[in-house]
Amino acid sequence: MPPKANPLKLNKLQLKTLSILQELTSDPGITERDEVTGGTRIIGIPAPHGNHFHVGARVVMSSDATGLNNEGVWLALVRKGLAAAGVFPFSIVVTPAGLGYDTGIRDQILHGTDH
């Protein structure tokens, strides 16, 4: 039997935010290992310019990233064990469970870049 899609019942904004956070964890310039959780601490959330912002080699539309500035979304991810508390809105830890969670929408919101 295949695994259930979205078993923690994240809403669309939470799924988008987690997808972006997962991608941000691959950037060694803004991350560090969190010894307490075994996860990855993001210590630099990129700022949008115009209608998008860059996440490594990918581009995210600003409209898909509103959860990065929504404390309620961060708290929901913490409650569900996908993140650990950081300093909103500057840093957050993506736990091993969060790193491995299949949001199913990664390719819908993370686009290739042409500049």
Label each region the model flagged.
Residues P3-A5, R79, A97-H115:
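Short, amphipathic alpha-helical interaction segments positioned at domain boundaries
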Residues I30, A85-P89:
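Short, solvent-exposed secondary-structure capping/transition elements
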Residues S62-G81, F88:
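Short amphipathic alpha-helical interaction segments
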Residues F90-T95:
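Minor-groove-contacting beta-hairpin "wing" of winged helix-turn-helix DNA-binding domains
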Residues N51, V55, M61, G72, ...:
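A generic structural signal for ordered alpha-helices
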Residues P2-A65:
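Short, amphipathic alpha-helical interface elements at domain boundaries
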